[in-house]
Amino acid sequence: LQLADALEQHMPALLRANKKDLAAQDPDNPRNDRLLLNEQRIKNIAASIRKISKLPNPTGKIISKNKLKNGLQVEKITVPLGVVGAIYESRPNVTFDIAALCLRSQNGCVLKGSQEALHTNRVAVQLIKKVLKENDLPVDCVTLLPSEREVVQQLFTATRYLDVLIPRGSDSLIQYVRKNSLVPVIETGAGVCHVYVEKDAAINKALDIVVNAKVSRPSVCNAVDTVLVDEKIAPAFLQRLQAL
């Protein structure tokens, strides 16, 4: 909760850093939307952190137990993973998401963001470390790595330091990490979202859904990529969709 409060209090510093990152990009690149922070998006990140803080503690839960014939009690208990490595692209909100989730689940995290979000991520992690220090927690349990691509190769072989590696981003990034990492990998979804328009669908409502699923934020990984249309409704639906 303190992290969410601190994020809102230090919003100007985060916005200044984000402007530096945006100024270094091609202004016509549609992917800049992934990098962009504004007041509302920062408030949304803070709200997400508050939701995470209210999640039940996932550690220390007894999943199963049984007693052996010799009297030994055997229990399966949830424990932290340890140190989580995260590789992700130019989405500053991911820095806060991963840090908050790892702290809630009593894991440390090593963050490898993209060069595009360098200044934003630095300020974000400085803010996180400030809150950790104020609560007498080890500040290095959230660590930001240099943004150079060479660092990724080092993460792949860091079996002594990382317990799991999580890539978050495009399908090409996820597959590259999965194929090359010696550290165990948790593979996330890569988007490629589909919308299916059924033959009895209400055309106006279906059009609204398809347009919103793509146009509202084209850069996010859960934006629609493929529209499948039943052949019985295809002529009418596709004509209306094309007219948009």
Located regions from the model:
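Conserved small-residue-rich beta-alpha loop and adjacent elements
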Residues: 47, 51-54, 58-131, 135, ...
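N-terminal Rossmann-like NAD(P)+-binding subdomain of aldehyde/semialdehyde dehydrogenases
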Residues: 1-74, 101
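Short, surface-exposed connector motifs at secondary-structure boundaries
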Residues: 107-110, 136-139, 156-162, 220-223
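A structured beta-alpha segment of the ubiquitous adenosine-cofactor-binding alpha/beta core
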Residues: 38, 51, 69, 73-76, ...
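General beta-strand structural signal in soluble alpha/beta enzymes
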Residues: 61, 111-112, 143-146, 166-169, ...
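Glycine-rich, mobile lid/loop segments that gate access to catalytic sites or pores
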Residues: 36, 112-133, 147-157, 169-174
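ALDH superfamily catalytic-core signature
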Residues: 6-12, 90-93, 97-108, 123, ...
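Short active-site oxyanion
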Residues: 83, 141, 161-165
